[in-house]
């Protein structure tokens, strides 16, 4: 009899926990943003691209985000503060892409600072808003945080490398849920694509109190000096990669610096998935379906640029 009571009691506990966990799961599912939209910041065109428009976004960044289940809004330059306010309230995160404009004086940098400041303020009031920086975007994050250009020359242009993981990477937001297989691939195989002449050295990071207190170093690499290749903020959903995960599946320039192995494609997928899942935590939304539709990058057609640039396709804007 006592045993029967124990069994019934055990089943009661199991049913209780199952019901509680089921309701918790459904709560999470109900509150997850299933239609995330991420902004990509445009930047000034170089002389090669100027005939197509005054600013551009490489299409590989768009595909990177779309591949993990989000849509894209181009964040164009030279817009009013009111327009940037409206865009910020409408999108669920922003990506600062790679490129070659000036960190201090470009319109790209000016607009990035607007969104960076808004993101800090929003996250401080528990309004989740992630930022992702790739290559120049990664460098720009260090500039916006420190107020200084602390980059050093590394000439790391056209290289693939494995990443040197730090102890801090093990409990990082970015890599914590990565399958062990992918983690080991990044650490042992040359699947990270580097196209940068400048980098933030670990020495300059260590000497700068603002950077030390704001960013956790997740990976480093060495070329001439040791530099930071992946980082994330301690308190904010802000992430930077000096390398180019979007190039692996979407850029086909004949270059030794772009890996196309199945392993490298897996790496890209898991990083894109991480970023989009961060955006799913944001509840920002457009004021109407029409406003949303009018803002999406679907309103623009990519141009094939693979015969004369490092990008296969790019979007251009006036």
Task: Give a label for each model feature.
Residues 2-236, 243-318:
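N-terminal beta1-alpha1 cap of cysteine-dependent amidohydrolase-like domains
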């Amino acid at each position: 009899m006592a045993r029967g009571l124990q069994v019934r009691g055990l089943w009661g506990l199991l049913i209780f926990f199952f019901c509680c966990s089921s309701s918790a799961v459904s709560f999470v599912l109900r509150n997850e943003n299933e239609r995330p939209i991420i902004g990509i910041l445009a930047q000034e065109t170089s002389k090669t691209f100027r005939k197509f428009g005054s600013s551009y976004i490489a299409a590989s960044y768009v595909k990177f985000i779309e591949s993990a289940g989000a849509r894209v809004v181009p964040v164009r330059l030279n817009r009013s503060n009111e327009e940037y306010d409206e865009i910020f309230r409408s999108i669920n995160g922003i990506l600062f892409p790679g490129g070659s404009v000036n960190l201090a004086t470009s319109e790209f940098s000016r607009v990035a600072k607007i969104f960076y400041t808004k993101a800090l303020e929003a996250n401080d009031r528990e309004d989740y808003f992630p930022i992702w920086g790739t290559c120049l975007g990664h460098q720009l994050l260090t500039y916006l945080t420190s107020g200084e250009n602390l980059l050093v020359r590394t000439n790391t242009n056209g290289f693939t490398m494995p990443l040197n993981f730090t102890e801090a990477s093990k409990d990082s937001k970015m890599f914590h849920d990565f399958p062990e297989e992918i983690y080991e691939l990044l650490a042992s195989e040359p699947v990270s694509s580097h196209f940068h002449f400048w980098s933030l050295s670990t020495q300059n990071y260590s000497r700068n109190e603002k950077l030390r207190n704001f960013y956790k170093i997740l990976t480093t690499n060495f070329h001439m000096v040791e530099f930071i290749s992946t980082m994330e903020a301690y308190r904010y959903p802000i992430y930077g990669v000096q390398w180019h995960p979007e190039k692996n599946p979407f850029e086909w320039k004949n270059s030794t610096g772009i890996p196309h192995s199945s392993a490298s494609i897996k790496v890209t997928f898991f990083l894109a998935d991480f970023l989009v899942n961060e955006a799913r935590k944001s509840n920002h939304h457009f004021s109407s379906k029409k406003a949303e539709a009018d803002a999406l990058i679907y309103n623009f057609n990519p141009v094939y640029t693979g015969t004369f640039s490092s990008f296969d396709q790019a979007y251009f804007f006036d």
